[in-house]
């Protein structure tokens, strides 16, 4: 192994690629944005031939302005780099079209693929098509539709912090009425549990508060559901590790993402601390 590590950051314009690269730069990566795909091999050779410290890390940003043929050939390039002993990973960022259009409206920036009076929706559609080869080979995808800049930086920082010590697990709570996290590897439904929302004295609290915890723990169904989720995840974690996975996202949802899912996510994250190299916790609807 060469000791080099390369992260390719790509995704839809407006989904947070610049934030991702800045976060990696702060974490000690040497970052290059808008690098042509054809030069990735040259960058790898440069890094291998110079007197670089062991474990040096690079990150490159790629977008849809690369020639379509180059984007289609990227998977072959990445395979060649891995065969050379370079630890290579692809991070793909995306968001719903309505969110991207709103972000462009707020920043008044022009989409890189927009030509003349072409509608933004057409440019976004073309970009999704061009970048599909990257999304298909991504090791890690993040839907930033409901993710703040702070949240995105935190997710990437957590990933980088745990990249050298085995499997990292993100446990996330969410509300079904706000949409299922599309980047989750496992999704569990806690709506079968009694809802604290319908208890007037508990409605204003969350699953992080003792009063809600006490209510849920008094329900026999809660312990049964938690035990089944915890057992399933613990059973499959070693399998994911043996398969070479470095990151796993477990999502637990309830109706609004305030009580039941928050409680279960808190407990699951605490339970998984034993046996996992790195466990992080995020409450999407409480962010």
Swiss-Prot record:
Q: Which InterPro entries match?
A: P-loop_NTPase, RapZ-like, RapZ-like_N, RapZ_C
Is Ion transport tagged as a keyword? Answer: no
| Keyword terms, alphabetized | ATP-binding, GTP-binding, Nucleotide-binding
Which SUPFAM superfamilies does the record associate with it? P-loop containing nucleoside triphosphate hydrolases
Residues that bind GTP: 63-66
Q: Name one GO molecular function term.
A: GTP binding
Answer whether the UniProt record assigns the keyword Nucleotide-binding to this protein. Answer: yes
Instruction: Give the residues the record marks as binding ATP.
Output: 11-18
Please explain the role this protein plays, according to its UniProt record: Displays ATPase and GTPase activities.
- Note the NCBIfam families from the entry: PRK05416.1
**Per the similarity annotation, which family is this?**
Belongs to the RapZ-like family.
What name is this protein filed under?
Nucleotide-binding protein Hhal_2130
